[in-house]
Design a protein with these regions (language model features):
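Short, flexible helix-coil linker/hinge segments at the edges of structured domains or between repeats
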Residues: 134-148, 223-269, 297-310, 351-361
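Residues that define the transmembrane beta-barrel architecture of outer-membrane proteins
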Residues: 100-106, 158-164, 197-205, 267-273, ...
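Long, internal scaffold/assembly segments composed of regular secondary structure
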Residues: 257-393
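Outer-envelope beta-barrel architecture signal
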Residues: 73-80, 115-121, 173-177, 214-220, ...
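Transmembrane beta-barrel strands of outer-membrane/channel proteins
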Residues: 77-87, 121-127, 170, 179-185, ...
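N-terminal, post-signal peptide beta-strand-biased segments of exported outer-membrane/organellar beta-barrel
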Residues: 41-131
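Outer-membrane beta-barrel translocator domains and adjoining extracellular loop/strand segments
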Residues: 90-96, 132-138, 189-197, 231-237, ...
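Outer-membrane beta-barrel "beta-signal"
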Residues: 512-528
């Protein structure tokens, strides 16, 4: 669960925004690229306009990773550069994201559909900085717990990210098959100290199958992901570190584990398996059904290759959508359920002598206990209405639901439910060679139930607990607006300029968090 509007599900783009990241007094939210309008839309039919200009679509793509096989013959390329700034306050985001960020990012994606095969891929590089980062200095702490290093300093961190991925698919009669993969890397280091605090390698691979029936396309996709992070840190004399029980932003702490350490070096391993099944309609008024199961295992280990703690997590996701198409109008209604359960294990070791001459010893596990449990669920409803006019497109959407988070370690617990509501409206206007778009988004979250018992901790822990209480339990209000102007160089090429601004307020505070972003886009789309 994120805190800022643009960190939510509905954005003024055809893909979700990247998570916020990076610099001195600032933080970003990356608006990801639109599928570009590349025809003289003022002179085309409504159905063609709706397809090209559709920048917000809540329905999953038909065929999952094989989606190019179920589109018309085309070649598509989109490139986007963005510069974004975020300035916030305590409680708007979780402590590990800092109080301000700034980021530059360059993103490119492309796809092609030929007679017998299709392919799509993407690449991205981003460089950013964040300031006043307190607590956990890992790159992705939510993936690894119960063992997490908690740092009590406030740091200025620089973060570099890159990723590359894609899928190649082939169709034979009604059968489609595809293979794909991706690699992502992140390096995070202090602004004054160039030694890396964290290095990340994230590799994933997938295999997908699909089959076309008279009324449906059936698709199945299996994914495997392997993630590792090397983490090293040197502290000031007065700093403390703690091993944290952590669940999607929430830590429950055992003060008996708290230690004063000048340095720490840990390696984290994360492995994930996922299976997704989908039935996508090929005719009007039929529902889309999609279910997914995910299992992952994560642990941290020292330089002695000893597991400190380990977690097991199971996730279940279900989606049901009903699309209704009436000539120039389209209505989509759906429900979405997410459920995740994670268990953390504490591991104890004893020293075993393997050989006396020479003297060789090793650490052997002798005791494992399920000390930590966490459950998260999210129930959402979706509603989307789109109306295509001869030279314009109007789109209105809503996503709302109830999110629940429960964590427990020993006698300590944190239980919370909150209502999350998102609303967006988009209007796009087409001319012979120009077009413009205006998108307005609103966010509101409200805690409806909470129950918590914190351990009695030191002052810096109390500050961290206060930030978590603000984030989860105080109401959040936000508004964001995007204006984009585009020019068609040729019938197949388009360039665009977009400016985004927004704010978010927590509770009755008079100090909001501010966001602004500048984006430049180039798009190419050739339909055959």
């Amino acid at each position: 669960m994120s805190s800022f509007i643009s960190y939510r599900m509905f954005l003024c783009s055809s893909m979700p925004w990247h998570a916020a990241i990076a610099i001195v007094r600032i933080k970003l939210l990356s608006l990801v690229l639109l599928l570009f309008s590349t025809t003289v839309l003022g002179k085309t039919a409504n159905t063609e306009q709706a397809h090209i200009a559709d920048t917000i679509h809540i329905l999953p793509k038909t065929g999952l990773a094989l989606y190019p096989l179920y589109e018309g013959l085309h070649d598509r390329l989109a490139v986007r550069y963005a510069y974004a700034v975020w300035q916030g306050k305590e409680g708007i985001r979780l402590p590990q994201y800092g109080l301000s960020e700034q980021r530059h990012s360059l993103y490119a994606t492309g796809a092609t559909r030929q007679q017998k095969w299709g392919a799509h891929g993407y690449a991205e590089y981003a460089h950013g900085q964040r300031t006043q980062v307190r607590s956990i200095a890992m790159a992705q702490p939510e993936r690894f717990y119960p063992y997490i290093v908690l740092d009590t300093s406030k740091r200025a961190l620089t973060r570099e990210e890159y990723q590359l991925g894609g899928t190649l698919s082939y169709v034979w009669h009604d059968l489609g098959v595809g293979i794909g993969g991706s690699f992502a890397g992140t390096t995070q280091f202090g602004k004054k100290d160039p030694r890396p605090l964290a290095r990340i390698g994230d590799f994933s691979t997938l295999l997908a199958l699909s089959y076309r029936l008279s009324h449906y396309v059936l698709a199945a996709q299996g994914d495997y992901s392997y993630y590792s992070e090397s983490f090293a840190q040197t502290n000031k004399k007065e700093d403390r570190q703690d091993y944290v029980y952590y669940h999607l932003g929430l830590g429950l702490y055992d003060h008996e584990l708290s230690v004063q350490k000048r340095s720490e070096s840990v390696k984290y391993i994360f492995a994930e398996y996922a299976l997704t099944l989908q039935a996508a309609p090929q005719q009007r008024y039929l529902p889309l059904v999609q279910i997914a199961y995910n299992h992952n295992n994560a642990f941290g280990r020292t330089n002695l290759y000893t597991k400190i703690a380990e977690t097991e997590e199971d996730k279940l996701q279900a989606k049901l959508f009903f699309p209704f198409i009436f000539s120039a109008q389209r209505l989509e209604v759906g429900v979405h359920v997410d459920y995740a359960q994670r268990t953390g294990y504490e591991i104890d070791y004893y020293t075993h002598q393997v050989n006396t001459s020479p003297n060789i010893t090793e650490e052997r596990e002798y005791h494992r206990v399920a000390a930590w449990k966490g459950i998260q669920s999210h129930y959402k409803a979706h509603l989307s209405y789109r109306y295509a006019m001869p030279s314009a497109l109007f789109h209105l959407g809503y996503e709302g639901g109830l999110a629940s988070l429960q964590t427990r370690h020993g006698q300590y617990y944190f239980e919370q439910r909150r209502s999350v509501q998102n609303l967006f409206a988009t209007y796009r206007r087409y001319y012979a060679h120009y077009d413009w778009l205006f998108c307005l988004q609103g966010l509101w979250t409200q805690s409806v139930q909470k129950r918590v018992l914190w351990a009695r901790e030191a002052r810096f822990f109390a500050q961290l607990q206060n930030s978590i209480e603000l984030y989860y339990n105080e109401p959040h209000y936000g508004l964001q607006a995007t204006f984009e102007g585009g020019y068609r160089i040729t019938p197949a090429q388009r360039i665009a300029f977009a400016l985004t601004g927004g704010f978010e307020r927590i509770g009755g505070s008079s100090e909001p968090a501010w966001l602004w972003e500048l984006a430049l886009r180039y798009g190419f789309l050739n339909r055959r």
